[in-house]
Amino acid sequence: AMGLITINHGEFNRLHNAKVLLRAHGEPPETYITARRNNIEIIDATCPVVLRLQKKIKQEYIQEDNEDKQIVIYGKNGHAEVLGLVGQTTGKAIVIEKLEEAKSLDFSKSIRLYSQTTKSLDEFQKIVEYIKEHISSDVTFEYYDTICRQVANRIPNIRKFAASHDLVFFVSGKKSSNGKILFNECKKVNPNSHLIDSAEE
């Protein structure tokens, strides 16, 4: 790969006087602090949609009333993008992966709900409705649909495509959130859909 080496956070922390490309998922503030301290030149390829979301969450978090509200992120625990988002709140944001987990929120406190950019719009809307139904009228609930339309807008087309073919091979990395969402849409309309990520498969 033309001399490009992939590193993890542990290896990044030990680097000095190097040049590092950050991938699209975004990074928590600590990564940039480490880069300055260790004289690491950052080439920031963070997706602009993710960057805007990080800023939005940080602004919400630094407001004076943040003790009285919950910042909630609908996303996958441990996902690179989610780690970057939670990092904007010094680890205070609550991450929920599915509707079931929304039931454990404190509905006597205000809630600000955001979403990982690559999550399911349908599930996000169900979570919004659930919170609306259960939150106390004495507090406020604001939600921000921060799901990337590059993925969401493809869903109607991919459903149509999968329904019009007998067999679908969906080529994607097995860990890709975008890939999983789009493949699941194929599978819903055509059970004879298969996720593959290599020529061997």
Per-region residue spans from a language model:
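The feature marks the mature, well-folded catalytic cores of soluble enzymes
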Residues: 1-201
